[in-house]
Amino acid sequence: MEIKVVQDVKAIDADILVVNMFEGEKTISEIANKYAIEQDNFKGKFGETYLLPTYGQEVYKKVLVLGLGKKSELTPNKLREATYKAIKKCMQMEAKKVAFSLEGIEFDYSEQFTMGTLIADYVFDKYKSEKKDNKVREVYVQANEGIVRKAEKIAAAMTFARNLANEPAQLATPSELANIACDFGLETKIYNREECEKMGMGAFLAVAKGSAQEPKFIHMKYSVENPKKRIAIIGKGITFDSGGLDIKPASSMLTMKDDMSAAA
């Protein structure tokens, strides 16, 4: 998916133009106001959507009204969630080219809009022989381009972490995660079993006894000149967790590989 920053989204010949609506207010689209609000009494509650054709009156084919709820209650996180829902709806309609017209929002929505858009685009289909072709390919929005590009990098990192978490446990082994960690260009130290024993990491090693895979304790360090403070982030990296003494039920089998998500 490619996000393009433009000045006039209504001039884009999109498959769908997404317009936001606050409760008790109208949209920028006269067609949406006439049919969604006046005829069908669409309220614009948070997360609700209303799709209608433009009947050839506009360059874009359809309008998707996206409810944002009460204006006073809209937060950046809620905007990200709403954007996610809008993209998913556009994917259901097999739209390839989507434009967003976000009006009346009282904060810079560039980052959260980008995050919601790209998170909605995520799917792990690496091992599927048949892949669905219902993705939105182009998204147009009027936003801060610098913030959009930065948010794209954050979303790419999230995608990378999700891909690691979704890999089968026989492939995403402790040794494989250690190899990946060493490729990031950070100061990285991988501690083996013997080194962990010397540090008294009994609980960590007790978990490792349940696997034929060798344990790897990964320590990554990012340094800058004259740091104001030190921050330690600890992420659980159990690559397959069946529950230990309390074995998880069969219904939890699909998520046993997810226990390394924080480390990813």
Q: Locations of the language-model features?
A:
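Short amphipathic alpha-helical segment within the helicase RecA-like ATPase core
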Residues: 1-237
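Alpha-helical metal-binding/catalytic segments enriched in His/Glu/Asp
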Residues: 181, 231-233, 246-264
